[in-house]
Amino acid sequence: MSETELLVAREYISRVPALLEGAKSSIQVVQFVMQLKGKSAKMSSRELGIKLAAKARDGVRVQVLLNSAGGGWRAPSLNRQAAQWLRERGVEVRTLGSSRTCHAKMLIIDGKVAIVGSHNWTPYALERNFEVSVLVRELTCVSRLTGHFEDLWKVSKPLVG
């Protein structure tokens, strides 16, 4: 198994569900924008949200950090909706709550595997856009990403609204 794997376009959504299902102790997510509600009966981003909620129910610590500043268009509104939906299902959700934009997109599973790249958890990003992310298993890199997540989590606060 390679220490890095390129996930182009829809390859991300074909790999992430199994990674989420395999989580044993922790899932850490950072997203610029997350859309879990919408008109589509089956949205890929909603499926990821459902998997996060199921893992939280199973006792896995699930932490989601969303952007709250800037972003224009609908990002803050979509993030508030996603935060409420996730919190109602036992997921810890926070925001940096500053004037600085958190544009990172990151997923860390059990401190052992991480994905970092351009994929937001929205139907467009997961199904239509030209996105690229990298799956990393190299533990020094994953450890550094985990440390970065934990630093952001410490200065974050619950998303209000």
Task: Map each language-model feature to its residues.
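Signature of lipid phosphatidyltransferase scaffolds
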Residues: 9, 108-161
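Short, well-ordered alpha-helix to beta-strand connector turns
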Residues: 23-24, 104, 130
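Structural alpha-helical scaffold elements that stabilize or flank donor/cofactor-binding regions
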Residues: 19-20, 107
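Aromatic-Pro/Gly-enriched surface loop or interdomain linker
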Residues: 1-18, 143
